[in-house]
């Protein structure tokens, strides 16, 4: 969305969870920490999420749900909300991308895009 009043920026840090993974069973677990920053001028509530999780074979899993980790945080202008969650994929490398559906204090609904980010076992990429 180009209206600067509704500017939500999303940053992601990922980590491979070796102790929760089982490569011989094609199970690769990852944790991710996401910061949702309200750089707009209007308070906004994160209502729901939409994820596309793609493994290294191109298989896509679509996930939709209310809020994030059981919460629907309201984020004031200049403030952020950080949370951690996880994903399990069947290949050593994959990607996630998606969006948050937001509801602004003025009644406007808008989407905050989550740019693609990589899930990768250390050393899996050269």
UniProtKB/Swiss-Prot annotation:
One of its GO terms (biological process) is error-free translesion synthesis. InterPro entries: ApaG_domain (IPR007474), ApaG_sf (IPR036767), Uncharacterised_ApaG (IPR023065). Residues 2-126 form the ApaG domain. Transmembrane segments: none annotated. Pfam families: DUF525. PROSITE patterns: APAG. It comes from the Bacteria. This is Protein ApaG. The lineage of its organism: Bacteria, Pseudomonadati, Pseudomonadota, Gammaproteobacteria, Pseudomonadales. The gene is apaG.
């Amino acid at each position: 969305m180009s209206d600067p009043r509704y500017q939500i920026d999303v940053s992601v840090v990922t980590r491979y969870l070796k102790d929760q993974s089982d490569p011989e069973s094609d199970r690769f677990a990852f944790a991710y920490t996401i910061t949702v920053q309200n750089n707009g001028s209007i308070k906004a509530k994160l209502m729901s999420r939409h994820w596309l999780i793609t493994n290294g074979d191109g298989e896509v899993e679509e996930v939709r749900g209310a809020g994030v980790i059981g919460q629907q945080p309201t984020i004031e202008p200049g403030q952020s909300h950080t949370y951690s969650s996880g994903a399990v994929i069947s290949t050593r490398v994959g990607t996630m991308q998606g969006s948050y559906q937001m509801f602004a204090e003025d009644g406007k609904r808008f989407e905050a895009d989550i740019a693609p980010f990589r899930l990768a076992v250390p050393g899996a990429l050269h």
